[in-house]
Structures are given as structure tokens and as C-alpha cells.
């Protein structure tokens, strides 16, 4: 038990070289409190070494930092603070049930900490790997990587927000966030991204109820799909964007699918979920069991794709038919 009524606790090791790596271990209770709680601070910092977190850290309304070249945070840990910063070289979020492993943070302790009122920031010099499902209903989770953020298991956000900050290492132009699972977002939650030194993007979250009306109202916006969509009995879908009013924005499906899209407009050009793409971006979306009929420039996802528009990590299944420039994913 370590208690600091003055509000600050700083445990650190400082190794002179790689032969003298330090270890900071926490398996008990560390508590820092001040009169207003806001200035409470606990910092566990293993310079060039390993920080093993397996106990309780309480900074109440203040700040907790757990850092080290190697950082291991098990699901036994309990963190109470306004903000918790996790800062290793690489980090893998997995199911760390009481066993300390290299560069691992337990998914359970992250979601419990978020749901108990703490904003959590995981910051890695290289990659962040989400290898276990994370679910939470309040506060903000920030994943900040020098290189890639690899989302290999679902992230479920029913309240609060998610921020993905990537390619933060100096000179990194290739880092990305890679969606290999689903990021499920309820309406009213926030989703933000930032690549390198580029400006932050605040995305608009859309679901089944507002998908079409929102995208069609502003074809230059930045949108993410928060849930899977199943369209049933709809054969009068009007493609988003046409030759006179192109879609020029960004759309990220976040690993979701849109099923049963049906368009029956045999005499009309530029048919698909999106009719006319101009300098736009779409990624991480799947169309399943689509039935699309048009004239020229017909594809399940995009009818006409031009001006360096990009489509990545996306697919379509179903039937597409027309008379000219017809493709399964993109017509032209």
C-alpha cells in the first residue's frame, strides 16, 4: 500500500544502458489524493525497462500514467482517474487474465476503466493490436500509434467515443488503421481519426435509420457506418450522387455490411450504392446479395468512379446487369 495525501506518486527506474533495464511492479494498492482530486497524479515509468501492472491505482479525479519500453497490464488491475495514459513501444490488447505477458494490456481492464468514468489513451511508438473485443458505454478511448492500428476484434461503443491516431512516428507516411473486424457505433457516439500531421477528422456516425438521408443531404461529408444494414423490399433505391451532383466525401464502413440492396433502373446511367464518385474515398464495407440493374456505368458499390477516387478493403456479392461499363464492384 502506497498513499500520498499530497496528491502525487512517481515510481520510476532509469537504466544507463540495455544491460541495466529497470522493472516497475504494481500488484498492491497505490493511492494519491489531493484536496480537490483534480491534481491527483500517479506515474509508473520504467525507463527502457518493464512496467508490470496487476493491482489498484487510484488517482480519483486526476491522472494516471503507466509507461515502459515493455508494459504489461492484466485484467486484475483497477484504475481510477479522470485520464489514464498507457505508453509502451508496442501494445497488444488481449484477454490478459492474471498472467503478465510482453507488451499486453487486458481488454477487460480497459472497458471497466472507461465505464467507471476514466478516459483511456493507449499510446505506442510502433503498432497497436486490438486482439480482444472491447465494449464500453461512456468516455473516450484513444488509440495513438506511431505506425499502424490493427483492429482484429470488434470494438463496441454504445456511449462516449473512439479516437484513432496513427502514423505519428516522425516521417511515417504509410501508417494506417486497419479494420479486420467491426467497429460498432451507436448514434450519438463520436468517431475521430488523425493521420500523422494531418488535421483531425470528426466523422458523422450513420446507421440504418439515417444512412441515406444524411449522405444524400451532404455529399462532401465524412461518414462512418456504425452498424450492419439490411434493406428489405426496396427496389427504388436512388444512387447517392449523380453526374451533376457527385459524391466527393469519405465513407468508411468500419467492417460492416449492407445487405439486399436492390436497384431496378434499366434505362438509367450511373447506378450503384453510390452513383457518381468524384475524388471520393470508400473503404471497409461489404455489399451482400445486391441486385443492381442500370444502363451504363453500373456497379454494386459505385457506378462511375473518377478523379482519383479510392476504394479499399471492400467487396460485393450479388447480380449486376446493364448494357455498357458494368462491373461487380465498380462499373467504370
Identify the meaning behind each predicted range.
Residues 1-203, 209-218, 258:
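Extracellular and secretory-pathway beta-repeat/beta-biased strand scaffolds
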